[in-house]
Structure formats: C-alpha cells, structure tokens
C-alpha cells in the first residue's frame, strides 16, 4: 500500500482514538450537541479504524512468517502462513481503499421517491403500484418511515404517479441507484389472449435538503393553486381546498401535495419537494456537461435511462447497467432489494477507484 495512504489511515486511526477519549469526558457528555456530533464522527471512523488495525496485524504476521522461512523445520508452515496472510492483506487493502473513497454528503439523508407510470396505460399504472409496494417493503425491512405526499391513482388500481418521503438511516445512499427507467414484461390481468405486454415506469430519487441548502426560489417565480384532495382519506376528502399545486415557472417543474388537511403543511412539503427537484435538475445538467467517456451508473430519473427489466413469465429481473440477471423476481417484488443494490454499489465504487487511480 502507498505510504501516502498509510499516513492518511494512521491519522484517521489517531482521530478515532481521540474521539473515543472525548466521548468519555464529562464536559463532552454535558454538551449534548457536541456529544451527538462526536458520536456521529466516531461511528464514521470505526470501520476504517477496525480495518486498519486488522491490516497492521496482518503486516506483522507477514514479517514473522518471512523470518521463519530461514528455519528449515518451520519453512513449510511459514510458507502457508505467508500465503494466507498476503491474501488477507490484499482483501483488507481493497476494503480500506473503498472506505477512503470520498463520501457523498447526501447519502445519509432522507429521500423523496417518485414513481410514474410511463408507456403501457393501465398496466403501467399497476406496475407503478407494484414498484411502490416493493420500495415500501424494502423500507419496512430497514425500519424506515414512508409518508405518501401525493398520489394520482390509476383507473384500475396502482398509480399514474406517486411521490413519497422515505425517512431513516442512509436512505438516499441505498436508493439513489433506483433513478431511471424500469420495464415490466408480463401478461396483464385484462389480456384475454395471454399475450405478454411490455410497460414502463420511471423512478426518480432525490435527497431531502436541509433548509440551509435549499436553492434560492423567488416567490414571484411560483404559481400556487389550491384544489380539493382526492383519493383515499375518508370523510375529510373533498371538503376543503387543502391540496396544493406549485408550478416553478422558469423550469416548468410542477409539484403537488395533498397529504395533510392543513394547506400550510401541504405547501411546506411541496416546497421541500420542489427544492429537491430543482437541485436534482441542476446536478443532472452538470453531470451532462461533465459527461466523460466513463459510464454514469447514477440515473437521472429519465425514461431513457434503462435500469431494469422485470420479466414475470420467466421470473427474471435484469439490471442492464451491470449486466446482472437474477431468477428471483418474487423475492425482488417483496422488497428484497439488497441482492440488486449491493452489486451496483460495488460496481460504482470500482468505477470511483478507477477514476482515482487515473488521477494519480
């Protein structure tokens, strides 16, 4: 491993020890804000510190085994130990390089998830409903909260469009690779001839921004309409104009929120989604301008980004970005998404490592 990387790891390890000592200090415990900030930092440094400690131990094991090679009686055992230690050292080195990759500050944030039915009419709306249920089940397994902000239901079930806020640990970091086009191939319930139809939906995942990072939005650029909320909601539906529709005139972005009975709360939530969308559009524009020969695994939420195909007759799900095919569609639709998310996260990290080594 390069000496510059070892020096960086040593500094991070020392900081980990320093933070650990501070967390046991009475003055730190008395200051709740400081204690919370240091606890977060400690959690972030723990993996690096643990992995680096293991790596240092392996380096010592390698030195010991090399010294034993001079002893004829110990040589065979030493060669075996040396081989095992070098293999373990290589694995730890790889892990450490991944842990040192620059962190996306958005990864730990909550996220807005939009699922829209695309081509395919009623069947696309039904599939949008299936996708939203899939993400909701995944959220449940990770103990995240899901709050629907706006839903435009399909005539025969599902959604023409649904927007929800997913809250919890590391939501955006796990879901950000879902942005893009999702295609389904199956026989619709309404199809009497048994023909397979292809429908599509688009998914957009955007981090929820803290107040300080919201883009500047000129109130004069907004058109705000109120209307009566529709859909599930019991006796309070259609009794007041509490639902809000905000149009950002310069970009044409439209956001609706009809979740709350209070117009005030709906407006605040809609503005939060609008800020996230405006920033996402700016990021997408910047990525396009910087588009190099390297592929971008992070989709823009545009239908032209073909992420996955869900083939029901074959029980198959294919991620086109990394050529991954799994015959585990039922589990996927039940929200067991880690088997699809993990490989793409690893591929993304490999791309980042390749980019860093090119810079060096």
Swiss-Prot record:
Keywords: Cytoplasm, Methylation, Protein biosynthesis. It is found in: Cytoplasm. The modification N5-methylglutamine is found at residue 235. PROSITE patterns: RF_PROK_I. SUPFAM superfamilies: Release factor (SSF75620). InterPro entries: PCRF, Pep_chain_release_fac_I, Pep_chain_release_fac_I_sf, Prokaryotic/Mito_RF, RF-1. It comes from the Bacteria. Residues 285-313 are annotated as: Disordered. Gene3D superfamilies: 3.30.160.20, 3.30.70.1660, 6.10.140.1950. It holds the Pfam family PCRF. Methylated by PrmC. Methylation increases the termination efficiency of RF1. One of its GO terms (cellular component) is cytoplasm. GO terms for molecular function: translation release factor activity, codon specific. Peptide chain release factor 1 directs the termination of translation in response to the peptide chain termination codons UAG and UAA. Belongs to the prokaryotic/mitochondrial release factor family. This is Peptide chain release factor 1. It comes from Klebsiella pneumoniae (strain 342). The lineage of its organism: Bacteria, Pseudomonadati, Pseudomonadota, Gammaproteobacteria, Enterobacterales.
């Amino acid at each position: 491993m390069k000496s510059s990387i070892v020096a960086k790891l040593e500094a991070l390890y020392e900081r980990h020890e320093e933070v650990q000592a501070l967390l046991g200090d009475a003055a730190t415990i008395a200051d709740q804000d400081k204690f919370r900030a240091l606890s977060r930092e400690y959690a972030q440094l723990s993996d690096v510190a643990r992995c680096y400690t293991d790596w240092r131990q392996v380096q010592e094991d390698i030195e010991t085994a090399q010294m034993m090679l001079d002893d004829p009686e110990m040589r065979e055992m030493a060669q075996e130990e040396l081989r095992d230690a070098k293999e373990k050292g290589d694995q730890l080195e790889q892990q450490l390089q991944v842990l040192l990759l620059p962190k996306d500050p958005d990864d730990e944030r909550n996220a807005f998830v939009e699922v829209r039915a695309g081509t395919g009419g009623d069947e696309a709306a039904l599939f949008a409903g299936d996708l939203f249920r899939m993400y909701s089940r995944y959220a449940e397994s990770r103990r995240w909260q899901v709050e629907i902000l706006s839903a435009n239901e399909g005539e025969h079930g599902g959604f023409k469009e649904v927007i929800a806020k997913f809250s919890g640990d590391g939501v955006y970091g796990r879901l950000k690779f879902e942005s893009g086009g999702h295609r389904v191939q199956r026989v619709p319930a309404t199809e009497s001839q048994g023909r397979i139809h292809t429908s599509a939906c688009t998914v957009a995942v955007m981090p929820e921004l803290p107040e300080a990072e919201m883009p500047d939005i000129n109130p004069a650029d907004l058109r705000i309409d109120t209307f009566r909320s529709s859909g599930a909601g019991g006796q309070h539906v259609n009794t007041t104009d509490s639902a809000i529709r905000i149009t950002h005139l310069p970009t044409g972005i439209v956001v609706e929120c009809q979740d709350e009975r209070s117009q005030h709360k709906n407006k605040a939530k809609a503005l939060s989604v609008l800020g996230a969308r405006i920033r996402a559009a700016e990021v997408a524009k910047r990525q396009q301008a910087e588009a190099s020969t390297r592929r971008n695994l992070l989709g823009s939420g545009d239908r032209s980004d073909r992420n996955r195909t869900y083939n029901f007759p074959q029980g198959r799900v294919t991620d086109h970005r990394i050529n991954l095919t799994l015959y585990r569609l039922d589990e996927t639709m039940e929200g067991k998404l880690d088997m699809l998310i993990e490989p793409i996260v690893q591929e993304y990290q490999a791309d980042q490592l390749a980019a860093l080594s090119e810079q060096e």
